[in-house]
């Protein structure tokens, strides 16, 4: 089975046009977090408003944003997945009509109860924990920890620190979904 690939952090329209033409990419991620160097600008949003994604699914990434901001910015995309990267509760995530992914940052273990709390998520994205940084660390965690949740009925999405040297191992661990960054 071929893994599904998400490229995240797209904020350049020319890069977006190139990525859409690539066959092996399934999801395109757009960050709506002002502290990120890959934050989407209002100008970019205007460009993407009528853009044809050619079968690729947009993923709008948020960190503790309010509902109005999420509804407004995600409306620029057709049927986006919402990816929650902050301290959003399961009730908050479930309050949207969109499919969503919840990010859980992993330090030394996976809290199975926390995974179960987000049972309505269409995917759980596991990423390395780094103090005061909600994501985009570029570092991996001990992927063997994923074994503690493999028997749960969830879509496992692996993110952080995936590169040419470890991509085969990443595929073996997560089976189906990988998230890769754009270049900064």
Regions found by a protein language model. Give the residues of each.
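Conserved N-terminal beta1-alpha1 strand-loop-helix module at the mouth
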Residues: 1-150, 154-158, 162-175
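Conserved small/polar residues in nucleotide/adenosyl-binding loops
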Residues: 176-182
């Amino acid at each position: 089975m071929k893994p599904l690939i998400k490229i995240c952090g797209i904020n350049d329209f020319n890069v977006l046009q190139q990525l859409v033409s690539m066959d092996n990419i399934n999801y395109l991620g757009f960050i709506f977090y002002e502290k990120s160097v890959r934050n989407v600008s209002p100008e970019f949003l205007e460009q993407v408003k009528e853009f044809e994604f050619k079968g690729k699914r947009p993923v709008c990434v948020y960190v503790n944003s309010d509902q109005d901001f999420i509804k407004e910015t995600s409306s620029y995309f057709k049927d986006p997945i919402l990816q929650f990267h902050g301290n959003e509760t399961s009730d908050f995530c479930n309050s949207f009509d969109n499919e969503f992914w919840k990010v859980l940052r992993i330090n030394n273990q996976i809290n199975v109860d926390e995974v179960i709390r987000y049972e309505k998520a269409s995917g759980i994205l596991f990423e390395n924990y780094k103090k005061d940084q909600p994501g985009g660390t570029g570092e991996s965690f001990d992927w063997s920890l994923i074994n503690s949740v493999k028997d749960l009925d969830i879509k496992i999405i692996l993110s952080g620190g995936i590169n040419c040297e470890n991509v085969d191992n990443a595929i073996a661990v997560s089976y189906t979904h990988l998230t890769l960054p754009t270049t900064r």
